[in-house]
Every structure is written in structure tokens, then in C-alpha cells.
Amino acid sequence: MRDQTLTRREFVKVGAAGAAGAALALTAAGTEAAPAMPERPLGRTGHKVRIFSLGGQATIEKPGTRDESIAIINRAIDLGVNYIDTAAAYGRPRTEGKERWELDGWSQTYIGEVMATRRKEVFLASKTDDRTRDGSMRLLEQSLRLLKTDHLDLWQLHNIMRDEQLDQIFGKDGAIEALQKAKDQKMVRYLGITGHFDPAVLVRGLDRFPFDTILMALNPADKHHLPFVSTVLALANKKNMGVIGMKIPARGRIFKPEGINGIKGPLSYVLSLPVSTVIIGCDNVQQLEENVEIARAFKPLPAAEMARLEGLTSTYVNDASWFKRDAAGWTRPGDDDQNTE
């Protein structure tokens, strides 16, 4: 889950974006009441989350963006966002000879600056991309330190792609031991799993452990190849799990002149599915405000409109679902970062 840069540069009308921002500004000034974002239950956790949540990528994971990142995070909370997602891997420097837990990621660092004073206002989620017990515990300690908190509301296995990873996680001294230990010691409240690569692998993961939540890729192109909707989403709903959608703009690749040309369609599409919330990383406050405005005004799409959006993506599935590329047998030169939401 990355930014919507292509959306803004190429497709979103300045007037529409300005109108959304102006409406939210009036609300902030107290001169006009805006509807609150709808809430949904986060599965069996008992928590209610707003239908739009803030992702910890895009600007928030980049070095040198402290002021912009803190502005986005604070504005999100001001607008009613009560779920923030991040990961130990987000914004982590790539330094040879260093272990994961020796490298502090920018996303958790920036979010932690805000959490120092606003922790009680949000449900805070992070992730471990280490598949071992000891490595994951070190990453959890790092997350708590950077996020300036004594516990996470949700700790997740990050981007499960292959059965070999599941075997390591559930094997001797695997990461699942860290998740259980952390929950027993009240360092985390709930446990989750995430992925956007191969839905069959995630289904097998759900069969091996009673996770509380799942973060999965969902957008109008999903149904065309290796669908998450009919497999992972269906199983997660059956298990009464909290479901968080990601990859809605697909790093901007879902937007094409001949296809989908704005964020409202795909965001409304995913919110019309049986999900608890969605996460999107934002480049700036204006993007955040536009997403919140769409969420506030959300009404479920009729089946015909859902089908129309799916049809628009049918000619560029390998772009709109690029994150499935290896599992789907596609390749794109230069796409070397699978460890993102």
C-alpha cells in the first residue's frame, strides 16, 4: 500500500479535490458540522474502527519527511481516523551487515512522535517480517520503543508469501512462538497475518492458527486472477475475523486513461465488500482529506457498478494487481520490493 501520486498528478480534478479540502477545513474551523465516518466491528475483537484508516507508507515511511508525516498523522486523528497501521520494515534503511532490529524504520519513528501524546486515540497495529521467535521479539521491542508505547493493539506476521515461510513460522523457535508469548505477556492485544501475494498460502495460514485479523489485498482487479475475495475474504468472514483491505490504488497503477481514473471508485468498491476497514498511505494532507471525505459520504455500490469497475481493470490486470506478479507468473523489471503493503 503506497501513495496515490499518479492519481493526483494525472487524474483527479483540482476543483473536486479543492472542494473536499474546503469542506473539511470548514469542519476544522467549527463553522460546519461534517458527518462522522461510519464505524464497523473489527471482527471478534470487540473494537469498532472507522472505515478509512491510515497506512504507514507513502510519505510516512520516507526519510526527511518528519514535518509532513506528523502533519498527516495528526490530521488523520483529528478527522476521526482511529486505526493506524505500520510495520518494522516500513522505511527501514537497507544496510549490509546489520540485523533488522538494528535498523530503525522511519514509519514507526514518525508515528511514535505523535503517539507520545495521542496513543489513547488510536488502535495501533504493527508487524514483524522476521520468521523466527527471537528475531520477532527483538522487532517487537524495537516497535514499542519507536512507537513510544508499552503495548500494540495488533501485531501481525508481515507479508506471508510462500508455504516455506509458514513452515518456518510454525516450526521450532518460529515466529508464532513470539506472537503467543507477546500476547501472554500483554505486550500485544491481538494477533494478525498479512499478505498480498498468493491467496492460497494465506488460506493455509488461517487454517493453522486462530488469528484475530487479516490484512489482504483488495481492489476492483482482484477477481481477474488469484482472487482474494472468493478465497481469503470468504474464509476470514466465516471465522469472524477483522478484515483490513489494502492495495486499493495499487501504488497508483490502478489508474489508467482508459480505465479507472480516480480514487473514489476503487475505495468505494472495497468498502462495499465485507471488510472492517481499509488502509491507504497518503502523500500529503490533501490526499488524506479526500479519502476521509469519500469515506464519510460512502454508500454501498450497486452490483452493476461493482461489475463496471471490475470490467475497467480487465485489460491491465498485471498492473492493477502487480503485487501478485510472481505468484501469477508475471514479471515487471524494477519491481523488487515485495515487503510492502
Could you tell me what each predicted segment is?
Residues 26-52:
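C-terminal segment of N-terminal export signals and the immediately downstream linker at the start
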Residues 42, 54, 84, 111, ...:
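Conserved, mostly hydrophobic/aromatic
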